[in-house]
Each structure stands twice: as C-alpha cells, then as structure tokens.
Curated annotation (Swiss-Prot):
Keyword Transcription appears in the UniProt entry: no
Coiled coil (residue ranges): none
NCBIfam families: L18_bact
Organism of this sequence: Rhodospirillum rubrum (strain ATCC 11170 / ATH 1.1.1 / DSM 467 / LMG 4362 / NCIMB 8255 / S1)
GO MF, one example: 5S rRNA binding
Entry keyword set: Ribonucleoprotein, Ribosomal protein, RNA-binding, rRNA-binding
Protein name, per record: Large ribosomal subunit protein uL18
Entries under PANTHER family matching the protein: 39S RIBOSOMAL PROTEIN L18, MITOCHONDRIAL, LARGE RIBOSOMAL SUBUNIT PROTEIN UL18M
Gene: rplR
C-alpha cells in the first residue's frame, strides 16, 4: 500500500504535467499549504522566475490575521496576490493546486484571486 506522501507526489506530478500541456506559455499560480500558513506565487516557467508572491507571513497581512492557516487567511492571500499581479501587469494565469484537493483553503484562495481580477 502506498503512503499518503507517495500518493500526494503522484497527484502533484500528474497535475503539473497537465498544466504543462495545456498552459500554452501562460504564467502559473502555484499554491503551497502548510498547517500554519498559506503561500502563493505566480511563476514564469519559460524563464524559471517568480514574478509575484504573497503569503500569510507577509508583513502586510500578518497584523490583520488571527490565524494563518484558515480559509479567511487563504482568501486574504489570494486577494493580495491578485492585487500585486494586476499592479505588475499580469492578469492571465493557470492555477496549479500543487497536488492539493480543490477544497477548503485552496478553493478560498482561488476564489478570492478570481474576484480580485485574475482570470484562470
């Protein structure tokens, strides 16, 4: 029987492969979720550079949040990331859930980013 970390890695690589096939050179919004914090970044895979990032450990958000690992915090990260991306001139991205299920904090981040102006 495979461990949960092995299954997670399989899901992550399968997701990344599909994104590579379907992205057509668009930027990638990558999500990382830990038990305490939420991180998101927009990556240009052609150049291998992170263009915009936001997380619950940013100084802008740290004072406003009571917890860094709940849905409200994830929504704030999505909103901040979308604002920074729009200021830098990026609006079209491909969502990379990174092997996590599209539920809970990951979904809250994605919905907030969409509402703030990112399209994916």
């Amino acid at each position: 029987m495979k461990s949960s970390s092995e299954l997670f890695e399989r899901r992550r690589s399968r997701n990344r492969y599909q994104i590579r096939l379907k992205s057509a050179g668009r930027l990638r919004l990558s999500v990382f979720r830990s038990n305490k914090h939420m991180y998101a970044q927009i990556i240009d895979d052609a150049e291998g550079r992170t263009l915009v990032s936001a997380s619950t450990v940013d100084k802008e958000l740290r004072g406003n949040l009571t917890k860094g690992g709940d849905k409200a915090a994830a929504a704030e990260v999505g909103k901040l990331l979308a604002e920074r991306a729009k200021a830098a001139g990026y609006t079209e991205v491909v969502f990379d859930r990174g092997g996590y299920k599209y539920h809970g904090r990951v979904q809250a981040l994605a919905d907030a980013a969409r509402e703030a102006g990112l399209s994916f």
